[in-house]
Design a protein with these regions (language model features):
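Flexible beta-alpha connector loops of hexameric P-loop NTPases
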Residues: 20-22, 53-56, 117, 121, ...
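Conserved C-terminal guanine-recognition region of P-loop GTPase G domains, centered on the G4
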Residues: 28-36, 68-73, 80, 84-98, ...
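Short alpha-helix plus adjacent loop in nuclease-associated cores
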Residues: 107-127
Length: 394
């Protein structure tokens, strides 16, 4: 029912809509950027400020009429809400705007971005699982919208209610996807155990999407992974053996993983448990922060990252990397470092530029100090990749 043809939606016209509530930060520009990044032509961004959401449409009825005028005038095919919408509101909006107009919320937009970025079997399975779980309750409204809630003989089977049939089929598919992901997770656990046996500490890169993690990974591991393609360029984990200094004790496995995003729905976070598990099981976490962001945004995201690390039971040591200092002046760097240290009390915070290499020596030395107490029982193969500009211990 909800199968999406992403390729057919290239350059589809869309409108971004936000109901700006007092307690929520604006997501309008974030949604516009994500939508345009995966091929939508965003013709308008509409924002309505309200004390609370409307029970039928989230936005008020008058704003819905204004939205319909924009949709009709511009032949808009998709309406993207920055808010999280219950299924009943989605389908009431679709009824009012026209049956051919898709209405999605921020969570489904995120999943579309994921879908576009997915490169591995695991990522694709996780996306399918998240989408099925998130839209499971939508089946009844979807069927209502098309007026087929009674018994019917046809594709749903004789003598059964369509929703019940859909629900059973969806639950069965969810079970199969979960079983496949558990199998992949077991294989990852075996690989982690193998790394432990060889004595390689695991260093995981974590942080918000587009904070420079993959740029750092490419620089250190001499890789050419895609960067700068918008949110969620990395959806699966990538691991390489690297050395951050001259001694054998600086050898480790460097892991690049999926980027965080603020207020991600728990269903989506849970679907990516296996991927986030690489962060949770690492010996050291390099937590990347984009120092070029505004200080209030950085402060809010630091609190959010702290929460995510707690939710996934990450118990490794943490070094916060205030990245992209090449884009800001020294005064802003000082302000950013103060904001980070207030929210990561007792944690090392190091300003760097993964792009230019500025201050990477200090970071490499800190990494080496943190991982040197993990005993190495086997040397790194002769084909190991050495980090550029390795720090030589004094």
């Amino acid at each position: 029912v909800f199968k999406e043809n992403l390729e057919a939606r290239q350059l589809m016209r869309a409108v971004v809509v936000e109901c700006k509530l007092p307690s929520l930060p604006s997501r309008a520009e974030e949604a516009r950027a994500m939508a345009e990044n995966i091929g939508y032509d965003v013709v308008d961004v509409m924002v309505q400020r309200r004390k609370s959401d409307h029970h039928s449409y989230f936005i008020g009825p008058g704003k819905v009429e204004e939205l319909k005028e924009v949709v009709d005038a511009n032949e808009v095919e998709t309406v993207i809400f920055t808010n999280t919408l219950p299924s009943s509101q989605v389908f009431k909006l679709q009824q009012r705007l026209g049956g051919d107009v898709r209405v999605i919320d921020r969570n489904l937009l995120i999943l579309e971005v994921f879908d576009k970025r997915a490169m591995t079997k695991e990522a694709k399975l996780q996306i399918k699982l998240a989408k099925l779980k998130y839209t499971l309750s939508w089946g009844r409204e979807f069927i209502k919208l098309r007026g087929i809630m009674g018994e019917q003989v046809g594709w749903m089977g004789p003598g059964d209610y369509p929703f019940q049939e859909y629900y059973r089929a969806a639950r069965s598919r969810i079970s199969r996807l979960e079983a496949q992901l558990r199998d992949l997770d077991r294989k990852k656990e075996i690989a982690r155990g193998r790394r432990r046996e060889l004595g390689f500490p695991a260093v995981a890169l974590a942080g918000y999407t587009q904070s420079g993690k993959t740029t750092f990974f490419n620089r250190v591991a001499s890789e050419s992974k895609r960067v700068g393609l918008g949110p969620f360029t990395t959806l699966s984990t990538f691991a390489r053996k690297v050395r951050f200094g001259a001694s054998q004790s600086s050898e480790c496995i460097l892991i690049d993983s999926i980027g965080f995003i603020e207020d991600m729905h728990p269903t989506i976070v849970k679907a990516f448990t296996a991927t986030l598990g690489e962060i949770a099981h690492s010996d050291l976490i390099l937590l990347f922060v984009d120092a070029s962001e505004e200080t209030p945004v950085i402060a809010r995201r630091c609190l959010s990252m702290n929460k995510i690390l707690r939710e996934i039971d990450a118990d490794g040591q943490v070094i916060v990397c205030a990245n992209k200092i090449d884009l800001v002046d020294s005064e802003q760097v000082a302000s950013v470092l103060e904001a980070i240290r207030e929210r990561f009390v007792g944690t090392a915070v190091i300003p760097i530029s993964a792009l230019t290499g500025e201050n990477l020596g200090e970071l490499f030395a800190a990494i080496t100090r943190n991982i040197s107490n993990v005993k190495v029982t086997a040397g790194l193969p002769s084909t190991f990749v050495q980090a550029r500009n390795p720090v030589r211990p004094e």
